[in-house]
Amino acid sequence: MDFKDTIQQIVEKIAKQKDSIATEEATKNSFVMPVIAALGYDVFNPFEVVPEMDCDLVKRKGEKIDYAIMKDENPILLIECKHCKQNLNLHDTQLQRYFVASKARFGVLTNGIEYRFYTDLEKVNIMDEKPFLVVNMLDLSDNDIEQLKKFHKSYYNEQDILSTAQELQITIQVKEMLNRNFQMPDDEFTRYFVRNLNDGKYTAKLVDQYRPIVKKSIALVINDIISDRLNVAMKNEN
């Protein structure tokens, strides 16, 4: 079975079981450990996966990461797990502390459904505030699977991942901005169209006038793109 098929099996399992998972430990056993195994690591081999690895800081003792993926006796990926219904926004500072205390270049914060991948692009050994990759197991794209595959034991290459991490991180932020403005164009986004259609001039009144038109126009463009792709697909089938 190839990697994609294995991941799809895990996705089906998550969809069926997510409402029955009562604890964080159950989340780890049912959702997270199968993903680690799918990445080619033996979860019962301490040379590959260390559960509850110490990540102590000078002023904080007893800090432990849920899982550390190992290579050549060094951690390469830290995984901090939460219950599958937990909001991950509440827990990123915890992973930041663990990241500083280790030599790993990558950290993952997950609730077994959403996986947020972090590294230290801005300052060495200081985890970035923004993840460079966010994967939702219940809304998985082919590209998500390809990005996950880069962390597979057989394909893992730290420099290759780092070389694409910044682009991925920026892509996430651009998509978030576009999504916000597609839902409700803000003043700056709307002014772009006002200026370009009025010889560089704009007023608050024009911005308010254009805002619903911009929103409607975006929806029409998206619908046109979808219709064009469907028409092409139908022609290819015929």
Question: How would you name each of these model-derived features?
Answer:
Residues 1-106, 116-238:
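A short, conserved, highly charged catalytic patch centered on acidic carboxylates
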